[in-house]
Curated annotation (Swiss-Prot):
CDD domains: AdoMet_MTases. This is Mitomycin biosynthesis 6-O-methyltransferase. Its EC number is 2.1.1.316. Homodimer. It comes from Streptomyces lavendulae.
Amino acid sequence: MTVEQTPENPGTAARAAAEETVNDILQGAWKARAIHVAVELGVPELLQEGPRTATALAEATGAHEQTLRRLLRLLATVGVFDDLGHDDLFAQNALSAVLLPDPASPVATDARFQAAPWHWRAWEQLTHSVRTGEASFDVANGTSFWQLTHEDPKARELFNRAMGSVSLTEAGQVAAAYDFSGAATAVDIGGGRGSLMAAVLDAFPGLRGTLLERPPVAEEARELLTGRGLADRCEILPGDFFETIPDGADVYLIKHVLHDWDDDDVVRILRRIATAMKPDSRLLVIDNLIDERPAASTLFVDLLLLVLVGGAERSESEFAALLEKSGLRVERSLPCGAGPVRIVEIRRA
């Protein structure tokens, strides 16, 4: 008698393959944590000048020798570091080199951001987010993500570096993709450390800017713009975009900010911007937009936003609905680089 094969009752080989795949997915958290520990200990930097023994690495990092050896042996099996197989030596390879400290590398900065204990605690409470639709960060850490990054300089630095590395790449893409030549003034709302504003001002010498950001980060933006020789063309405005937005600019920019907030807060922000806009002002929303077949990486970021801050990535239709509630409308949407980021040009309705 032949047993019918179904998704619940596959053949033996198919079942074994399915179990192996699921097991590999389940072990993903362990692999990530192992990488984080190697990064925290500074192993990639120590291997930059050549292979070293586990004994030497343990001495340099203050780690337990045998346990560090076990950690590196595991990571070598997934392609991070090379186990040379003789003399207890481990070496750098293409994957581990990506983890070297580099403010321009989204992977290197994100590896350090993800390693933070408060980040891991938030993911432990994912069930809370799925049940309630709210951020789990607050429940896991006893404070909000925004409060933590405001009060804790180390947390703020980890976050700003992670965001800054992404912005370094995207800033030039925005300046290349959108023509600001018809504008005299631009306001960057939640402009971070200033890389976007710097790129736009560099590309369009006739433009003057204002950057609105929370006080601790606003000073970092001032330093960057001063270092780029742009301080005389950009006012730094420390403040809260829920409270105040400068009136009457030709162009307003807001990049990777709206996805940090739930729908009600997005409408609050957009209404505040709409009030500040002139009848002929343009608002550029630069953000990930989910299309019909989004990449897994986009959907992971979507879930990360939920866990950390209760935010979300949105589709064009979802975003358009929020704009309508805010008295705004989409004029057009432009690609920005090869990924899911779009520049959405918006006018008052």
